[in-house]
Amino acid sequence: MSHTLQHPQPPAQTPAAAHPVSAPNPQKRLIAAFGILAIVLIGLNLRAGISSASALYHDLQLVVGYGAFTAALLPSIPTLCFAIAGAATSWLVRRVGVEKAIAIALVTLTAGLALRAVPSVGMLLLGTIVSMSGLAVCNVAMPSFIREHYAHKTAAMTGVYTITMSLGATISAAVSVPLAMQLDSPSLGLAAWAILSVVTLLAFIPIALAAHRRPAAAPSPATSPWKLLKTRQGLLITAFFTIQAIAAYSIISWLPLILIDGGLDPATAGLMLGLAQVVTVVTNIGLLALASRPGGLRLAFMLASGSYLLGAVALLTLPAPAAVAPALLLGFGFGVFALVLVVISKSGSTTADATAMSTVAQSVGYLLGTMGPFGLGLAHSLSGGWTLPLILLVGVAAAQVVLAWLLTATKRDGVSRDRGGRNTGATTAVPLAEGSPA
């Protein structure tokens, strides 16, 4: 009898004991909430330092007084730093973990932005290099951070991240000129964005402190970053990331100046770049929703890439006062960045795989992506106008459309399938170790 009375006891306590196991849940929920806040704030930072400078290049050149070479070099520094510092991110993540790597990056970003307050060519260049190096680490580490902490919400969290990234670019492009006028200094207008990075760092500190002190596992030889370039899927992802970086940063760097030279005032030209980013915020939601549907990944990639091509043609053929049309089309086209980030985040079967893919795609992509802003600036200096640079940009946009088709063609309908050909329901890339198309 005492046996029968004690028999129900363990089952009754097992469920009860299951709840104490999740007793740290409130703390985990708090850290998860801080994580979402950090994703939002980091997203706001990632383009603010670039778009604010883009809107102020005209005023900076007048006040600081740099020549044509520096004018062509400055817009190329972000992509160059994204390539070089981005390549070191995989090593840094292995050494200290993804959370601490991001915390270090935010400190670096803040220091670099603050340096740009000094109105001299040397401090402008140094501050840009330091701040963009911090952004580079965030760029590469964030897909891994999202995968590690929000594995079942990768697409949704990537959407939040890219939407806030676009918002940061929109706000900074729109308010940088008025802010600089208010502060009576384009250098102070640039440095003011250090306030946002300080707030982000403060929000991220609890996450870094709560992180386990274990270094992230090194990628296996099959997913070692540079070996991914020998796989078809790794090569296609890297090639596409490269072409979209060339296309996007060419516009982010030069659109205001193109429109100013066409007759628009600096404030309106900055607003056009802001408008493009607003459109990106809205279209990102639709593109990510479309990409998550069976067969929708290819359509989303083609819509975004095709829109960018039309925007580049419109910018070439329409007068500056009609800038709203190309701004809308280019803004829609920027949405392809969110799509390729989702593909990177879901690449392979582990966080280490995603970090490896993110490292190689962003390092190579941004290194070659420097050809965009620098090439357009050089073509403008040599030709004395924007016709030749914009013809080159149309060619880049056409190449992006072709690569979008090839990338999504690695799956018959953009939907991941298992070995038996069954739909797994995920719009992901082939596991990277396979290295072959489906």
Model-found features: residue ranges?
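Helix-loop-helix hairpin linking two adjacent transmembrane segments in secondary transporters
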Residues: V121, H152-K153, G159-L209
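Juxtamembrane intracellular "pre-TM" segments in multi-pass secondary transporters
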Residues: A18-R29, L209-I237, G425-T428
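Helix-to-loop junctions at the C-terminal end of transmembrane segments
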Residues: A85-G97, T283-G296
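Extracytoplasmic gate region of multi-pass secondary transporters
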Residues: A53-S54, R232-V281
